[in-house]
């Protein structure tokens, strides 16, 4: 029988989830992020190099681990592309290891502009 480990944070903040997932991810075949957005990030050190992940699951550092971004994630395309570029520049291979649900809600630059305009109208 295959075993699963589910880590759920209930404090809406820095609870150390990223460090726990990183610790266990090398023992699993898959690491899934099921909800949330491009958060403040969790810091991971691999071979004394610092990585800060916001969207991509920390299992990405292990060749045998498939990483999934699920449909409950609010996906910032700009943040995702920036994170992928930073990982690739540091020699992390993502090819064939990262899967993204086609049902993710997209957070586009237009949404940030709308929020800025709304704030200007409400608070000026």
Where are these regions (language model features)?
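Glycine-rich, N-terminal phosphate-binding loop and its surrounding beta-alpha-beta segment
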Residues: 41-116
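Catalytic core of tubulin tyrosine ligase-like
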Residues: 120
